[in-house]
Amino acid sequence: VTTNLSHKNSIKPSNQLFGTLPGLQVLQKAGTVWENGATLYIRGNSSLNSNSPLVLVDGFERSIDELSSEEIESISVLKDAVATSLYGIRGANGVILVKTKRGSVGAPKITFSYEFNMASPKRLPKFADGYTYAMALNEAMENDGLAPRYSGTELDAFKNQTYPGVYPNVDWLDESLRDMSYGDNVNFTAQGGSQFVRYYTMLNFLDNRGLLKPTSDNDGYSTQLKYSRLNVRTNLDITVSPTTTVQLNLLGNFTEHNRPGESTDKIFNALFQVPSGAFPV
């Protein structure tokens, strides 16, 4: 079974495989889409040991997430007796064969594409303001037989924002998140050749900037979620004789990943758990 990923818009090729190949289970991990590739199963998660299939890119074992979808020609899945007969114990959990694009006989063909994408949260909850939080806290303490935490004067200060430094009303989502995340995907390919030499060359630059608002308080440090990747590939096919063809595959992968000191999960947990009246900005 083969599939083509050129029409998929996910960043990680492993995530792009969802729903494309019969018998392949794709489990996307938590966190941002560029932080974690998917976990792949062919025979299912049936043991305590590794259930990951063997992934071969042009015959060599490597992660599929090191590639860009633009350079992938096709993906095949081998399982059961076929996988074990060809690859032995290494193919016990199935085999995923990835073929990258190659040159063909003909005039040079050059393509260039640019994609700009934006994404926004589908739905964000509306949290209680500082005054509502203070009222709810007073009610909770009274229900427990305790004295109210805030007096009437303090409640008025929350409501009217008379002293915001002492009785704050902070919208943590608005303070921490942008309305949109942005990304660029630039792709350049050239392919062609003669009956003796055929070539395929690709340059792919991917840049994604997340929802967190960047800060400029400290030079050289940014809290923004950012993922940049440059992929360079050249595949050569050289026909030496009618019975001999030499293949040369070159791949370069350069990645820059910037994130805050905490994980994405912890950041959003804090945004959802810290009350608006806890402390000022």
Regions found by a protein language model. Give the residues of each.
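Outer-membrane beta-barrel and related beta-rich outer-membrane complex signature
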Residues: 121-130, 211-215, 247-278
